[in-house]
Amino acid sequence: MADEERLKEFKEANKIVFDPNTRQVWENQNRDGTKPATTFQSEEDIKRAAPESEKDTSATSGIVPTLQNIVATVTLGCRLDLKTVALHARNAEYNPKRFAAVIMRIREPKTTALIFASGKMVVTGAKSEDDSKLASRKYARIIQKIGFAAKFTDFKIQNIVGSCDVKFPIRLEGLAFSHGTFSSYEPELFPGLIYRMVKPKIVLLIFVSGKIVLTGAKQREEIYQAFEAIYPVLSEFRKM
């Protein structure tokens, strides 16, 4: 019973880690065969290969974290009859006993929307800011076609999740001891070290394998900045 209570407290303290949008990424990262971050041979290669928004972010490590999930919110500006939405929209499900929102999916961009009766909408699964906005507009248009006076307003990115692989094992015990102010490491409860960076305000999940998940960003640059800030620390605690 004590262990169950301890696990409950741990999850409560680390809600962002156990949020489904983040959890899916770290569970995939913690398996073999996951797609690693892009690694380049030189700084010039990085500058040539990275898009404009990614340039000058990897001068230290040679690694650019991959964006895995973007969570955005939209206000549709009208109340919705969720039964009507679920009845007339494709790839939509509504089970009010389980969850008080319509769950709708589209294939391009591959995303999922949670649509609430209040007219609030949460869109997850996009791999870029542009795809997130495009998907959100598509969902709003679907609601309009059903017959509601929906508008596309107040689009906001709430969370960006990224990941990468530093390609070397990390001594998590040493890292936790040396950076105890920022670190939480309970290997019996969670396989990774949870590192709460102050600036930028990002949570990093660091695994002994060298896989890293970064979450809590509002802009992609924060993902890149956080990784470049943590990389020298990870190198210091590299397993030899």
Swiss-Prot record:
Residues 44-57 have a biased composition (Basic and acidic residues). Residues 21-61 are annotated as: Disordered. One of its GO terms (biological process) is negative regulation of DNA-templated transcription. Its main location: nucleus. It is found in: Nucleus. SUPFAM superfamilies: TATA-box binding protein-like. Gene3D superfamilies: TATA-Binding Protein. GO terms for molecular function: chromatin binding; disordered domain specific binding; DNA binding, bending; DNA-binding transcription factor binding; RNA polymerase I general transcription initiation factor binding; RNA polymerase II core promoter sequence-specific DNA binding; RNA polymerase II general transcription initiation factor activity; RNA polymerase II-specific DNA-binding transcription factor binding. InterPro entries: TBP (IPR000814), TBP_CS (IPR030491), TBP_dom_sf (IPR012295), TBP_eukaryotic (IPR033710). It comes from Saccharomyces cerevisiae (strain ATCC 204508 / S288c). Pfam families: TBP. This is TATA-box-binding protein. Belongs to the TBP family. GO terms for cellular component: nucleoplasm; nucleus; protein-containing complex; transcription factor TFIIA complex; transcription factor TFIID complex; transcription factor TFIIIB complex; transcription regulator complex. Keywords: DNA-binding, Nucleus, Repeat, Transcription. Binds DNA as monomer. The 1.2 MDa TFIID complex is composed of TATA binding protein (TBP) and the 14 TBP-associated factors. One copy of each TAF1, TAF2, TAF3, TAF7, TAF8, TAF11, TAF13, two copies of each TAF4, TAF5, TAF6, TAF9, TAF10, TAF12, and three copies of TAF14. Interacts with TFC8. Sequence repeats lie at residues 67-143, 157-234. General transcription factor that functions at the core of the DNA-binding general transcription factor complex TFIID. Binding of TFIID to a promoter (with or without TATA element) is the initial step in preinitiation complex (PIC) formation. TFIID plays a key role in the regulation of gene expression by RNA polymerase II through different activities such as transcription activator interaction, core promoter recognition and selectivity, TFIIA and TFIIB interaction, chromatin modification (histone acetylation by TAF1), facilitation of DNA opening and initiation of transcription.
